[in-house]
Amino acid sequence: MTTTPLILLAAGGTGGHLFPAEALGVELMKRDLRVRLVTDSRALRYSGLFSKDMTDVVPSETVRGRSPLALARTGLMLATGTVVALNLMRRLKPAAVIGFGGYPTLPPLIAARLKGIPTVIHDANAVMGRANRLLSRRVNAIATSLPGVLDKEPSLIGKTTTTGTPMRPAILAASTVPFATPGSDGPLRVLVVGGSQGARVMSDIVPGAIEKLGSPLWQRLVLTQQVRDEDMARVRAVYERLRINAELAPFFADLPSRLASSHIIVSRSGAGTVAELGAIGRPSILVPLPGAIDQDQFANAGVLADVGGAIRIVQSDFTPDRLAAELSALAADPARLAAMAAAARTVGRLDAAERLADLVMKVARLDSPA
């Protein structure tokens, strides 16, 4: 009896890593392959393709400091995780292991290489992440969402393929919804999100910006905002005082459909968010996460801003006054919103899951006729 080949998908436990892994998993299952997820404990809070019986948790640790103690802790956790991952490889015997970034992918990818199992890494950012960079010279193939990510690494170009970011079925469904240009006096739907982990800066800045918009826009505004539990009371109080039509929650499971129904999205610029905005084609105001060593979110936001699909505001400039000015200008110019939506869609790639699945099957030597 022939056993159906298994592909292990390794991803850090946040939406930006997990959602592309889920999208690839769906495509591989369509091709009659089995898939499992290898991740860290954070991923267990997400519902989706990977049920608990399809998920293996491997000990891992993100680098959180440069002190000897912090580095020693990280090293110990990664070593422990690699031992666990080696046992996993022996038990599961996967045909290939695919990494989607984040330090939790290091143990399974290292274990796969030690066992001679084919490996692929996918990076969704405009600047390759640190974990993937550590793995890049040791894997069989590299997939990137954007062209030119490794132009300064000539030794890696030969094994690099630009696939785009695999999109979940819900995003693909949302991408079929055309942008509904708002009327000059009709509802203006604004969605504020901070990534899968939320962003306190949105709770600090957005309510003050909304207050500065004034009564005519307050009456038009239909606001949906992701707000952490600890910030909920103070944010809600502002909107209730202004009588804003606002829906607040720590997390929206139906985010793809909310993206599709929005006129303006205010968000961080994680790779997954930028890819989804391109796939669906919606105008956005993007605030890159500051302080990152490689400034990946700044570069990600540039992908949309450079084609006119987004407004990029660095966090030091992200004030209530600045946001209110941008929102007022967009609300007064429906034609500009429509143009931004069309521009954003030009960077979307809807066939990325198929392209990445083709690469995986090639590396795993599963693409030959039976």
From Swiss-Prot:
Positions annotated to bind UDP-N-acetyl-alpha-D-glucosamine: 14-16, 125, 168, 196, 297
Predominant localisation class: membrane
Keyword Cell inner membrane among UniProt keywords: yes
Pathway the protein takes part in: Cell wall biogenesis; peptidoglycan biosynthesis
Methyltransferase as UniProt keyword: no
Keywords carried by this UniProt record: Cell cycle, Cell division, Cell inner membrane, Cell membrane, Cell shape, Cell wall biogenesis/degradation, Glycosyltransferase, Membrane, Peptidoglycan synthesis, Transferase
EC main group: transferase
Top-level taxon of the source organism: Bacteria
GO biological process assignments: carbohydrate metabolic process; cell division; cell wall organization; lipid glycosylation; peptidoglycan biosynthetic process; regulation of cell shape
Cellular component GO terms, alphabetical: plasma membrane
Membrane protein topology class: Peripheral membrane protein
Gene Ontology terms, MF aspect: UDP-N-acetyl-D-glucosamine:N-acetylmuramoyl-L-alanyl-D-glutamyl-meso-2,6-diaminopimelyl-D-alanyl-D-alanine-diphosphoundecaprenol 4-beta-N-acetylglucosaminlytransferase activity; undecaprenyldiphospho-muramoylpentapeptide beta-N-acetylglucosaminyltransferase activity
Catalysed reaction equations from the record: di-trans,octa-cis-undecaprenyl diphospho-N-acetyl-alpha-D-muramoyl-L-alanyl-D-glutamyl-meso-2,6-diaminopimeloyl-D-alanyl-D-alanine + UDP-N-acetyl-alpha-D-glucosamine = di-trans,octa-cis-undecaprenyl diphospho-[N-acetyl-alpha-D-glucosaminyl-(1->4)]-N-acetyl-alpha-D-muramoyl-L-alanyl-D-glutamyl-meso-2,6-diaminopimeloyl-D-alanyl-D-alanine + UDP + H(+)
EC number(s) per entry: 2.4.1.227
Pfam families: Glyco_tran_28_C, Glyco_transf_28
Cellular localisation: Cell inner membrane
Similarity section: Belongs to the glycosyltransferase 28 family. MurG subfamily.
Purpose of the protein: Cell wall formation. Catalyzes the transfer of a GlcNAc subunit on undecaprenyl-pyrophosphoryl-MurNAc-pentapeptide (lipid intermediate I) to form undecaprenyl-pyrophosphoryl-MurNAc-(pentapeptide)GlcNAc (lipid intermediate II).
Protein name: UDP-N-acetylglucosamine--N-acetylmuramyl-(pentapeptide) pyrophosphoryl-undecaprenol N-acetylglucosamine transferase
Protein species of origin: Nitrobacter hamburgensis (strain DSM 10229 / NCIMB 13809 / X14)
Name of encoding gene: murG
